[in-house]
Amino acid sequence: DVKNEEILNDLLAVNNGTKSLTDVVGKTTPELTDQLAGKEMVSPFFDLKPVNGGIKNEEGKYVVTISVPSLTKAMTDVQILHYSTVRNLFELITPTSVDYEGKTITAVFEDLSPVAIIAKVDASKAADSTLGTSPKTGVASTWMVFFGAAVVLAGVSAVAYRKER
């Protein structure tokens, strides 16, 4: 939970697109702004909270696996931007594991607070990753032609049947 209202408003503004990530991070941790260059947010900021006390390693740090539905192989240098509410600073955390197939990221945290997933996104690979998933567009459908022909045939048959009677 973010106690600093200014930081909370800044994180919400980044999520809404009204503030840039580098401006917000630069306020408290200016040394990270260069490391954010060329990276995009893969997820909005969200709050990490331990479930049943969380899982800790032998050093007492939290081991967290995060589901990232938008994760694709077009993303490289995947990192977690973490705002520590305990230490009042942003930090970049390199995941211990990135599973593109399972769309999960595992990382180790000193404390749990708001995070956002960031990465370099290769637009050419991103375009290729959706190949075969979209329906064809601009293809004429013939079912209306057959329906129209059936209606005309039914009408002609009805007229011919009446003339015979």
Where does each model-flagged region fall?
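C-terminal beta-strand-rich structural cap/linker in extracellular carbohydrate-active enzymes
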Residues: 104-127
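Solvent-exposed strand-loop boundary residues in beta-sheet-rich modules
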Residues: 84-87, 121-123
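C-terminal membrane-anchoring or membrane-association module
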Residues: 147-165
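Proteolytic processing hotspots in large secreted/extracellular or virion-associated proteins
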Residues: 27-84
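Surface-exposed loop/edge segments in extracytoplasmic proteins
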Residues: 87-95
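Short, solvent-exposed loop/turn segments in extracellular or other extracytoplasmic domains
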Residues: 59, 98-104
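Predominantly extracellular/luminal regions of secreted and cell-surface proteins
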Residues: 1-27
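Extracellular Ser/Thr-rich, low-complexity/disordered mucin-like segments
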Residues: 129-146
